[in-house]
Amino acid sequence: MIQPQTYLNVADNSGAKKPMCIRILKASNRKYANTGNVIVAVVKEAVPNMPLRKSEIVRAVVVRTCKELKRNNGMIIQFDDNAAVIINQEGNPRGTRVFGPVARESREFNFTKIVSLAPEVL
């Protein structure tokens, strides 16, 4: 579960290293974001000479959470870190590669481009 002020890892090569969640989108009063939800984040650390800079406001999709994810078939999935993929206003990833596994729930939220770039879908 991701809440405001949570630091995440970036799972793509967009240039950001550590974004911090400042808002969960598509919910008026939601406190937590799970896998597949869109958040608004601020870049706290960035790679030099890349398009994304420090203190830039971006949108991101949560692709991995440390909190257990229960599926309808009874399977429970848990990742080692909280990670997100930086997206643009249309929902397409800003990077060209995605690192690490991605939860299958991203496909259900119509982020098929992120799922196709991922090396492993759990």
Swiss-Prot record:
SUPFAM superfamilies registered for this protein in UniProt: Ribosomal protein L14
PROSITE patterns: RIBOSOMAL_L14 (PS00049)
GO biological process, one term: translation
Keywords of this entry: Chloroplast, Plastid, Ribonucleoprotein, Ribosomal protein, RNA-binding, rRNA-binding
GO molecular function, one term: large ribosomal subunit rRNA binding
InterPro entries assigned to the protein according to its UniProt record, in alphabetical order: Ribosomal_uL14, Ribosomal_uL14_bac-type, Ribosomal_uL14_CS, Ribosomal_uL14_sf
SMART domains reported in the protein's UniProt record: Ribosomal_L14 (SM01374)
This protein's GO CC annotations: chloroplast; cytosolic large ribosomal subunit
Superkingdom of this protein's organism: Eukaryota
Disulfide bonds: none
Cell compartment(s), UniProt: Plastid, Chloroplast
Family: Belongs to the universal ribosomal protein uL14 family.
Function: Binds to 23S rRNA.
Subunit structure: Part of the 50S ribosomal subunit.
Name of this chain's protein: Large ribosomal subunit protein uL14c
Originating organism: Huperzia lucidula
